[in-house]
Swiss-Prot record:
It is found in: Cell membrane. The chain crosses the membrane at residues 47-67, 73-93. Gene3D superfamilies: 3.30.70.120. This is UPF0316 protein LA_0606. Disulfide bonds: none annotated. It is a multi-pass membrane protein. The keyword Phosphoprotein does not apply. Keywords: Cell membrane, Membrane, Transmembrane, Transmembrane helix. The lineage of its organism: Bacteria, Pseudomonadati, Spirochaetota, Spirochaetia, Leptospirales. One of its GO terms (cellular component) is plasma membrane. The keyword Cell membrane applies. CDD domains: YitT_C_like_1 (cd16381).
Length: 199
């Protein structure tokens, strides 16, 4: 028994294999494109350029197959479906990768100092300042952190004040990477006291 790959003109190739190839290729190139655009906003130019090359290469291969099969409606559906699916998957991948840094801003009328202390103890570098809201004085707490650590930081904040007001913004560029994964201010103070006692 001989086995051969279906050639163009074969119904299995035209209506099953080719649309599946177009769909999967389109999912891949659109997912890459979504991540590439986000990387550009994060100043990751080298990686974005490399992904752009791969994205366009896949697109050329796919569009060539679509043009060769203009009478095949399944190719159109696969192309459009792959675009929609690729956009969705690209956004999920970007969230999972959590590339770059974010600015976390917390506004609290009563617990700002405690929130700042807890974040500092956990190793986040924190800036706190006084402000005035529509209902009176508030404390404004700022910290720049890796996006993948936002959930961890928010758990600390909400343990102190569950209904605290906060906002998260994209920190497009920072001038240092040492503001994270370093001892917090309170922890550092404790270490300094221990060293002084030993001396």
């Amino acid at each position: 028994m001989e086995f051969s790959f279906p050639l163009p003109g074969n119904p299995i190739f035209d209506y099953v294999l080719l649309p599946c190839f177009i769909f999967l290729s389109r999912v891949t190139d659109v997912s890459i494109g979504t991540i590439r655009v986000i990387l550009l906003t994060r100043e990751k130019k080298g990686i974005a350029a490399s992904l752009g090359f791969l994205e366009v290469l896949l697109w050329v291969v796919v569009i060539t197959q679509v043009i060769k099969n203009l009478n095949n409606v399944f190719c159109y559906l696969a192309y459009a479906g792959g675009f929609a699916t690729g956009t969705f998957i690209g956004m999920i991948l970007e969230e999972k990768l959590a590339i770059g840094f974010s600015l976390l801003r917390i506004i609290s009328p009563q617990n700002g100092s405690e929130i700042a202390d807890k974040l500092s103890e956990a190793g986040y570098r924190v800036t706190i300042m006084n402000g005035h809201g529509s209902r009176g004085p508030v404390k404004i707490v700022f910290t720049v952190l890796k996006r993948k650590k936002i959930d961890q930081a928010m758990k600390i904040v909400q343990n102190v004040e569950p209904d605290v007001f906060y906002s998260i913004e994209n920190a497009r560029r920072t001038n240092t990477t040492t503001f994270e994964d370093s001892p917090g201010l309170l922890r550092r103070g404790i270490l300094e006291k221990i060293l002084k006692i030993r001396k």
